[in-house]
Amino acid sequence: MMSKRQEAFRADYRERVAPLYSGPLHVFLIYAIGLSGIWYFAHQIHGATWTDWLIVPATFLAANIFEWWIHRYVMHRPVKGFMGIYKRHTLAHHQFFTDKEWTIDTTRDYRITFFPPYALVGFMTMSIVPAYVASLIWSSNAAWLLMCTTAGIYLNYEFFHLCCHLKESPFVRTMPLINTIRRHHVAHHNTAIMMEKNFNLTYPIADWLFRTSDLDRGVIGHVFNGYDTAHVKTNLKKTRAATDDPKAALVRA
């Protein structure tokens, strides 16, 4: 059940969203940028060998760890120079969505669910550095495959995160991988553990690797856990009683 504090924060946040904001347009821009990038990068690949393709799983694992790292140490920490990310995520996203009520009501709530479209541009720009290194020590094909993979993972991230915050449906409940990350992420929205557990938003591999998952099972079990709560650790922190004063949410908003 949604608290009065969460209700107040949601109402206040929604009032601040620009009248002309369009959730579908927001998503369209993200995927237009991402898919256009992948199309361009893919068209630079010619005669890739099997050794070139090995960079795809390597990039996937590196991106999974980066996703975990930036979520834990930037999005949940007030780091100088990145305060905008911290405020948007910890102080806004985690008040709008909690483990008591984690779903969106309309497409205007995409504003608090998706990153701004320019974030993808920044992410692809960051990928140029490792891609350049790959071109030197691997091949030019490997570099372009790396760019394709990082852009694809970003789009994967946005889609999975949306699925975490949609209303309950047979699709999100039964679709493998999506049902896993949905339970994983909703648990992360519990304020008692959000600073310590469940930082992955695609596949909980890094959470398993660095022991920051709320589950006690192997990596395959983590990835295909679904909604199963049988393996949730019993020694997790419990949520402390907090004020339900709506004004408290508005002050922090």
Q: Which residues does each predicted region cover?
A:
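Cytosolic-side membrane-entry/anchor segment at the start of a transmembrane helix
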Residues: 1-37
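Short, flexible segments with low predicted structural confidence
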Residues: 33, 40-41, 45-47, 61, ...
